[in-house]
């Protein structure tokens, strides 16, 4: 599922070229410089986080590295136009590979946190033991994902990556800043259109697959909007706040889906059904009870989606260079 979602996220990146190229303006030149500085900062943050990934790493480190890899990849995609050179493609590909390598590791960390919360909430010893059963199922799975990710991360030289980024960003600009500005605006407008289409399908079908697609569309929209905001389009602050709230609500729903799948896999084994039937019954009952909240989660998502702030024209806010 994670790999499929990543592929959808990659394919969502639009390649739009301006038909007529106007002369560069002070605002467009300023935005190009701002984006260059922003890209350097994101490279620095990404390179600083990557070495902190260890088997005993705080789950927040894994989460933060995945977030910053998306931010970095989005900035690279926006800054370098297509067709991209092999070096630029590598600059874009490395954070994507690291993020994918950490996907299941991150899922296990989230699930273990949910299981611990379930154990703290219940007063029933039987339920506590049942959730401990799920925890014992998840721990070796996490260890396997940590080992798998570790092997993949060893193949990524972040120091070399930082040097490559510095070299590419130090090259003279070969593109009119106005074209870059238009590409940034078009990418956000395209994401809005894709988001609206995904929302319509999710509302019409209520299908889990379509809700997952809407989740990805929301993620794409948020990262593109965030990038535009960071390069002086400050009128998008309200939209960013709304997107963060919407993504949090979708995240709650998504975590439940991942939990349901993990519990189902944990109990749907022959030895469990033969030797741990009382535990399986308790977990299935817990699952059935929890799924009653699923429709409430979905309706909350659609309600938040309908509360989108007014979509203002994409006009940069002039600001002095700092």
Residue ranges with predicted function:
Residues 1-322:
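Function-determining surface determinants
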